[in-house]
Amino acid sequence: MISSKMMSSNPEEDPLDTFLQYIEDMGMKAYDGLVIQNASDIARENDRLRNETNLAYLKEKNEKRRRQEEAIKRIGGEVGRGHEGSYVGKHFRMGFMTMPAPQDRLPHPCSSGFSVRSQSLHSVGGTDDDSSCGSRRQPPPKPKRDPSTKLSTSSETVSSTAASKSGKTPERTEASAKPRPHSDEYSKKIPPPKPKRNPNTQLSTSFDETYIKKHGPRRTSLPRDSSLSQMGSPAGDPEEEEPVYIEMVGNILRDFRKEDDDQSEAVYEEMKYPIFDDLGQDAKCDFDHHSCSSQCATPTVPDLDFAKASVPCPPKGLLCDIPPPFPNLLSHRPPLLVFPPAPVHCSPNSDESPLTPLEVTKLPVLENVSYMKQPAGASPSTLPSHVPGHAKLEKEQAAALGPASATPALSSSPPPPSTLYRTQSPHGYPKSHSTSPSPVSMGRSLTPLSLKRPPPYDAVHSGSLSRSSPSVPHSTPRPVSQDGAKMVNAAVNTYGAAPGGSRSRTPTSPLEELTSLFSSGRSLLRKSSSGRRSKEPAEKSTEELKVRSHSTEPLPKLDNKERGHHGASSSREPVKAQEWDGTPGTPVVTSRLGRCSVSPTLLAGNHSSEPKVSCKLGRSASTSGVPPPSVTPLRQSSDLQQSQVPSSLANRD
């Protein structure tokens, strides 16, 4: 303001004002310069101080480094490893130098330990250090023990053992005896237990007899596992303790598994045998359930197989009842033990069919009966068709099993038919015999239970026999096994003998009437067959078969030679069978023999004699040549029956 006033008032004062302004500006510049210089000085001072401090720190660091390096070098020289110094140097560089250096440096033993590790890693041999290291490294074997304990877990054990092995291999190589024995024992023990444990797991999956086996291996594996867990303690102690530990665990596992197994087995058995038990109870034909079950086990299998082949033949009563519970199983007849009855129906027909065929020509009544039986059970064609498959299966099985096994198979499948007849028809074999037949036969006999209406069933038997006789000849191939054939002949003889006795036994009047008819027919047949036999039994059989044969199924026909053979064999066998039974039912026997169905009586009643008869029969059957599968079963049965009847008559004479 002053300057402005001055300027405004006195223009002369302008230079003064300018001067003052100039001075002010110069002062400001000087001040700014000083401030800047001061700041720069301060900065420089700070930098210098900083540098000095940094230098001092760096010097200290350098000194420390030198000290550490010197110490490391001294340690390395003392240890006597030139490269060790370099290694230590590396170690220091890697880690905080101060920390590792003093550790390595100060405790010589520790340093030696480090050196030992380096040695082991480098595979440097130092016996003293190695021994000390080995002692120290025994802990790694402890980890192995842990894996061994984990071996029970199996998966962890394997991984841990593998890792421990890989980590400790160098140690083992370098370590003295201690690490090795532990490692070896562990490795040895561990691998065997693993296999055993694996079987145990499998056994657990299939807890059957395997479950028992499982526990045995488990015990062994468990002791090993326990030993592994106890490896820390002396080897001897863990081994001693192992058995106890194993026993405890094994027993517990067994108990639990046993309970489970029992339950599962119980269910399984129920599935298996309930039908037979029910049949046995319903039939109450003096069949022992025990015998049935015991026999069932063996014969049932062949029966089931046969049943499969015979599935075409619908079971008369039992199978029909079973299907609802197991609709799908019907297609799979073998699984159901009940199905054996289906073959039984066919075979029973075959058992009686010889009589009916012989008498059918003479006895129209019987033929009517056969018609009746067909509706009752299944169409004769079904039965014959069923029988051929059955016969084939039995032949194959008999051949494979051999005479001895063939006999059981025959007894299991063919005998049941006879059993059924015995229990329900005048022919009915002795009950004791029926009981003896395998459970399958019992099941079959029981199957007729639905047929149990004695009059219709008996009538059906007589009639169906005539019709099923065609199928029955096929059943003969079924026994085709030599044993089977012989047994069939013997059974036929016994069967023939049985009719009279069975008549008295069986209270069913229709059966008795049928038997009387059969006997009359037999006598007629014997006479006629003796005459015919001289002529041509084969031709007559074919005619009778045509007349009688309801089954259109082509069944293996017996060549005339085979027929003659069969007749001859049957003639020999009937006599033997008669001797066996001690009954003169030869004609009946021959007819049945023609069918070659094994009567359970023979099988059950005469076990000792059966083998012989079966062998002979087996030959006769083989010689007789199971009918080739072309001729109707009726044809075969008629031919066989005719040939056999003459032979039986000749034997009687």
UniProtKB/Swiss-Prot annotation:
Transmembrane segments: none annotated. Phosphorylated on tyrosine residues by FYN upon stimulation with CNTN5. Keywords: Methylation, Phosphoprotein. The modification Omega-N-methylarginine is found at residue 81. The modification Phosphotyrosine is found at residue 268. Residues 149-166, 398-412, 461-481, 519-528 have a biased composition (Low complexity). The keyword Hydrolase does not apply. Residues 112-122, 198-208, 223-232, 421-439, 634-653 have a biased composition (Polar residues). The modification Phosphoserine is found at residues 120, 206, 434. InterPro entries: NYAP1/NYAP2, NYAP_C, NYAP_N. Residues 168-188, 533-562 have a biased composition (Basic and acidic residues). It comes from the Eukaryota. One of its GO terms (biological process) is phosphatidylinositol 3-kinase/protein kinase B signal transduction. Residues 99-243, 373-653 are annotated as: Disordered. The keyword Nucleus does not apply. Residues 150-161 are annotated as: Involved in CYFIP1- and NCKAP1-binding. Belongs to the NYAP family. Interacts with ACOT9, ARHGAP26 and PIK3R2. Interacts with components of the WAVE1 complex, CYFIP1 and NCKAP1; this interaction mediates PI3K-WAVE1 association and actin cytoskeleton remodeling. Activates PI3K and concomitantly recruits the WAVE1 complex to the close vicinity of PI3K and regulates neuronal morphogenesis. This is Neuronal tyrosine-phosphorylated phosphoinositide-3-kinase adapter 2. It comes from Homo sapiens (Human).
